[in-house]
C-alpha cells in the first residue's frame, strides 16, 4: 500500500541514448562541426519500478523504470512534489526526499537518508545510510554513512561553513 498524489508518472523510459555507430559521444562531438549531423539513438527500458509498503509519492514526481533491472523505492520512503528518480536508482527504507530533488541513473541511496529541497545527485553514486544532504547540495562523489553534507560541490557541513566564513573574510584581506 502506498499513497500516490496527482500527476505522478511511474515507469517512464529512462533518459538513455547512444550514438548511432556506438562510438564515444565526446569523440563524436569532436569529429562533427554541425549539430544537425549528430544522431542519438534511444535505449529502450525493459526494467520495472518496485515500490515498497508505506511509500508516499508527491504530485508531479517522475520515477523512470530501470533500463534492464528495476528502479526500487523501499518501504517507508516519502517523496515530496516534483522529484525525479532516474532509471536503475535504488532508494533505501525510510528516506525523506524533499521537493525538486533529482537523482541521476544507477545511484544507490541507503536507509534513513534525508535530502533537502533541490538536491542534485550525479549518476552511479552511493549515498550512505543515515546521511543528510542539505537543500541545494550538489553531489558528485559518493557520500559515506552518517555524514551531513552541504554545498556545491558537496562537502561535510563543518568544512562548508569554514569555507564560507573564509570567503566572507576575503574583502578584509589586504
Predicted regions and their residues:
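Structural signal for interior beta-strand "rungs" in well-ordered beta-sheet cores
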Residues: 2-23, 27, 31-156
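Long, leucine- and charge-enriched amphipathic alpha-helices
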Residues: 155-174
Amino acid at each position: 500500500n502506498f499513497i500516490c498524489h496527482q500527476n505522478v508518472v511511474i515507469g517512464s523510459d529512462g533518459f538513455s541514448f547512444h550514438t548511432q555507430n556506438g562510438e564515444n559521444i565526446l569523440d563524436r562531438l569532436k569529429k562533427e562541426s554541425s549539430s544537425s549531423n549528430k544522431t542519438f539513438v534511444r535505449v529502450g527500458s525493459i526494467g520495472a519500478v518496485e515500490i515498497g509498503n508505506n511509500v508516499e509519492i508527491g504530485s508531479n514526481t517522475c520515477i523512470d523504470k530501470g533500463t534492464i533491472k528495476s528502479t526500487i523505492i523501499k518501504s517507508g520512503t516519502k517523496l515530496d512534489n516534483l522529484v525525479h528518480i532516474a532509471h536503475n536508482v535504488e532508494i533505501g527504507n525510510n528516506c525523506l526526499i524533499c521537493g525538486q530533488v533529482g537523482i541521476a541513473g544507477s545511484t544507490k541511496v541507503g536507509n534513513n537518508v534525508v535530502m533537502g529541497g533541490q538536491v542534485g545527485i550525479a549518476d552511479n553514486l552511493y549515498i550512505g545510510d543515515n546521511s543528510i544532504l542539505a537543500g541545494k547540495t550538489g553531489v558528485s562523489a559518493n557520500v559515506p554513512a552518517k555524514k551531513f553534507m552541504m554545498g556545491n560541490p558537496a562537502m561535510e557541513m563543518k568544512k562548508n561553513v569554514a569555507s564560507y566564513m573564509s570567503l566572507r573574510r576575503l574583502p578584509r584581506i589586504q
